[in-house]
Structures are given as structure tokens and as C-alpha cells.
């Protein structure tokens, strides 16, 4: 009886897979960013990304689909030790770095919640999150500028196709820490909390990236994708 049930469920799985697979599209990101990015890059193979606030090898990842399906690789940066251990184990083609990113070299308080995707350096964000999530611990973390980290791990003239940043209220400081005369990603994904396109165009992140020759290309729920305009 048990064997018959096993065979039944196996056949059921095969049937549903054959029905759904031609019309389905797997994604790992929170808002479908990875599907959109894959469309933007037209299924480009062997691209290169930098993922700041990577969090996890696959869960909520903007880069795992590129890594898994299109053989991309890149740099994953996260201040959480548990995130780093997971990334190092499961993203072996990538460079995985356990450090915080800020607009200067400094030691910052890192607020860790029961939902690891919400961990943040931002005191303002921490105060908002603790109303609905449990603050597990506060620890002091070493931070460096993004330019310093990339200088230390990338070969000369490395082309960055995609920079994705998810640092829960700390994104602008990450952007300010880049060397824009040296590292110019084709596309950038950041979180902007403004809800309308009109407000997004007036946001401090948008104004900063506009000065670096980036323009809004697409918007999801919170994530905004910027494109480099040559």
C-alpha cells in the first residue's frame, strides 16, 4: 500500500510538472526582481554581479537565479556571520565576504531580528521594525567602503553587470561608498520606500544616482532598478 501511494504521488508530481513547467517561471527574489533582471539581460550567460546585503544563498536573493540558471558569478557581501557561512557553502563560484558596508571605515551597531532579511545598521529602521519583529541581538560590526572591498577582491577592469543593494535603510550610504570612476554597473537595484513614481524621482537615492548618469528603468513594490545612461 505504501509503495502504491509513493508511486501515485511521484506520477502526480510528474503530471503537474509537465503541465506547469512550460508556462511557469521560478523566482527566488522577494518581488520578482530576478525574473525582470533576467529579461533585461536577455538570458545573458556568465555575467558578473555585486550583491550587498546578500542575506542568503537563495532565499529572497536577486542573484541566485542568475547564478543557478545562467552561470553568473560575483561578490556577495553581508555582515551576518550565519549569512556568510551559508553563502560560502552554497555559492562556491562567488567571492563571499563577511563585512558591513558604509560610507566610511567605521564600527557600527548591527541590529539582528528574528527575520534575518530585516537586519540593519539603521537606527531609524530598527525602531520601526521592532514594533512588529523581535530584536534578537545588537553587535558591533566592522564596516568598510564598497570601493575598498571591491579593490581588494576584483581583478583590474572587472566589468560589473549588476549591483544589487538591500541593506534596510542603509542603501544610500552604500552607494556613496562606491568609486564611480572605477566601478560602473550597467544596472543597479536598490530599495526606495516612496510609494509613487513622483515621490521616487524626488528621493535622495534617485537624485544621487542621477548625478552618476543613472536613470530609473523599472519599479517593483519597493525595489527600483536604475540603468546606466552612456
Tell what function each PLM region has.
Residues 1-230:
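Phosphate/nucleotide-binding beta-alpha loop and adjacent structural elements of enzyme active sites
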Amino acid at each position: 500500500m505504501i509503495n502504491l501511494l509513493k508511486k501515485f504521488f511521484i506520477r502526480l508530481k510528474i503530471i503537474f510538472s509537465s503541465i506547469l513547467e512550460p508556462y511557469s517561471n521560478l523566482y527566488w527574489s522577494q518581488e520578482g526582481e530576478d525574473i525582470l533582471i533576467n529579461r533585461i539581460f536577455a538570458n545573458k550567460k556568465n555575467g558578473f554581479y555585486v550583491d550587498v546585503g546578500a542575506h542568503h544563498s537563495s532565499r529572497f536573493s536577486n542573484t541566485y537565479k542568475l547564478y543557478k540558471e545562467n552561470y553568473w558569478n560575483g561578490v556577495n557581501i553581508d555582515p551576518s556571520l550565519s549569512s556568510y557561512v551559508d553563502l560560502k557553502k552554497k555559492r562556491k563560484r562567488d567571492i563571499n565576504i563577511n563585512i558591513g558596508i558604509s560610507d566610511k571605515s567605521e564600527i557600527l551597531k548591527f541590529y539582528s531580528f528574528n527575520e534575518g532579511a530585516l537586519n540593519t545598521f539603521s537606527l531609524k529602521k530598527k525602531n520601526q521594525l521592532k514594533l512588529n519583529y523581535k530584536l534578537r541581538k545588537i553587535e558591533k560590526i566592522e564596516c568598510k567602503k564598497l570601493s575598498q572591498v571591491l579593490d581588494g577582491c576584483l581583478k583590474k577592469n572587472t566589468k560589473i553587470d549588476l549591483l544589487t543593494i538591500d541593506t534596510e535603510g542603509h542603501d544610500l550610504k552604500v552607494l556613496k561608498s562606491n568609486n564611480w570612476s572605477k566601478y560602473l554597473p550597467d544596472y543597479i537595484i536598490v530599495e526606495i520606500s516612496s510609494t509613487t513614481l513622483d515621490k521616487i524621482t524626488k528621493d535622495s537615492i534617485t537624485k544621487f544616482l542621477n548625478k552618476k548618469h543613472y536613470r530609473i528603468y523599472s519599479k517593483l513594490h519597493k525595489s527600483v532598478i536604475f540603468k546606466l545612461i552612456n
